[in-house]
Swiss-Prot record:
Gene that this sequence comes from: MSTN
Subunit structure: Homodimer; disulfide-linked. Interacts with WFIKKN2, leading to inhibit its activity. Interacts with FSTL3.
Cysteine disulfide partners in this protein: 272-282, 281-340, 309-372, 313-374
One matching Pfam family: TGFb_propeptide
Subcellular compartments: Secreted
Source organism: Macaca mulatta (Rhesus macaque)
Post-translational modification: Synthesized as large precursor molecule that undergoes proteolytic cleavage to generate an N-terminal propeptide and a disulfide linked C-terminal dimer, which is the biologically active molecule. The circulating form consists of a latent complex of the C-terminal dimer and other proteins, including its propeptide, which maintain the C-terminal dimer in a latent, inactive state. Ligand activation requires additional cleavage of the prodomain by a tolloid-like metalloproteinase.
UniProt name for this protein: Growth/differentiation factor 8
Record has Disulfide bond as a keyword: yes
Major subcellular site: secreted
A GO cellular component entry from the record: extracellular space
Site, as annotated: Cleavage: 98-99
Glycosylation site positions: 71
Length: 375
């Protein structure tokens, strides 16, 4: 009996002495595991963020049908960018892409960008150079995007130089045609009379939708136009070939097109920030800065909120995917399981130069992650 009591005392003594040591070790081990888990999660998110940025660059070029980023310098952009009302309004009203995903709707966009507005600058034409033995303005080449979309508006914008006294200006837009037997090379498109006051020059728009539609139906008839804006003394006030101090005052065409709207569906998901300890699949903030890429060819936005998905898709949380859970139970080693991916994405509007130095305002689908989920 005394031997049994002695064994019990020894056992209790060992529990008292050794117990706290074991608890401290377990606590330290648990803390180390938690720190290691958080560190791994941060590293994983950083890698995911970097991959997302590279993927965005590739997607933008692909969706805009560009093999490489247009090589346009800042100086060239200052010269090409029209100082005209429609473009200034787009830029002035532009803001960083808003993170507005509260409606929970998902657009089933086509892969390629949906163009809304195309601003086309004039280019040189051999035919124009031959008329009267001197250069004429203007010849416009049209993007294939205009060919395959419905044109709802087409405006020719011209800039008139300032006058010193109140002046009546006669504006005439002529369409070039193949020389006729009587030598005629022009046919009238529009004529209008303007009263100009002294001061700064003005921008004037002229509706050319019908002419554009005819050009699209018969591309061979597009030989260019000539612009005249004569004052009472016969001086031409239209800026067709900008001189010193007239950068950004070239004539240009503003063409608006529309596409069929897409249907929508609903979805939900978790939102986290960079300091979150959430391990499950979650949406994290990510701002893409185009200036950091050196992409000066993107006029607006200069940056936008793209967001990205990161986190685990543990099978214990997968009541939403019973078929995947059953597959995992049947073959746990052979099933990779669902991944944390975007389940809701929305487009961004973008104003940019394409490879032909045309200014395009369009909608690029699926560029903002609004919701993340396991799929």
């Amino acid at each position: 009996m005394q031997k049994l009591q002695l064994c019990v005392y020894i056992y209790l003594f060992m529990l008292i002495v050794a117990g706290p040591v074991d608890l401290n070790e377990n606590s330290e081990q648990k803390e180390n595991v938690e720190k290691e888990g958080l560190c791994n999660a941060c590293t994983w998110r950083q890698n995911t963020k970097s991959s997302r940025i590279e993927a965005i660059k590739i997607q933008i070029l692909s969706k805009l049908r560009l093999e490489t980023a247009p090589n346009i310098s800042k100086d060239a952009i200052r010269q090409l960018l029209p100082k005209a009302p429609p473009l200034r309004e787009l830029i002035d009203q532009y803001d960083v892409q808003r993170d507005d995903s509260s409606d929970g709707s998902l657009e089933d966009d086509d892969y390629h960008a949906t163009t809304e507005t195309i601003i086309t600058m004039p280019t040189e034409s051999d035919f124009l150079m031959q008329v009267d033995g001197k250069p004429k303005c203007c010849f416009f080449k049209f993007s294939s995007k205009i060919q395959y979309n419905k044109v709802v508006k087409a405006q020719l914008w011209i800039y008139l130089r300032p006058v010193e006294t109140p002046t009546t200006v006669f504006v005439q837009i002529l369409r070039l045609i193949k020389p006729m037997k009587d030598g005629t090379r022009y046919t009238g498109i529009r004529s209008l009379k303007l009263d100009m006051n002294p001061g700064t020059g003005i921008w004037q728009s002229i509706d050319v939708k019908t002419v554009l539609q005819n050009w699209l139906k018969q591309p061979e008839s597009n030989l260019g136009i000539e612009i005249k804006a004569l004052d009472e003394n016969g001086h031409d006030l239209a800026v067709t070939f900008p001189g010193p101090g007239e950068d950004g005052l070239n004539p240009f065409l503003e063409v608006k097109v529309t596409d069929t709207p897409k249907r929508s569906r609903r979805d939900f998901g978790l939102d986290c920030d960079e300091h979150s300890t959430e391990s499950r699949c979650c949406r994290y903030p990510l701002t893409v800065d185009f200036e950091a890429f050196g992409w000066d060819w993107i006029i607006a936005p200069k940056r936008y909120k793209a967001n990205y998905c990161s986190g685990e898709c543990e099978f214990v949380f997968l009541q939403k995917y019973p078929h995947t859970h059953l597959v995992h139970q049947a073959n746990p080693r052979g099933s990779a399981g669902p991944c944390c991916t975007p389940t809701k994405m929305s487009p961004i509007n973008m104003l940019y130069f394409n490879g032909k130095e045309q200014i395009i305002y369009g909608k690029i689908p699926a560029m903002v992650v609004d919701r993340c989920g396991c799929s």
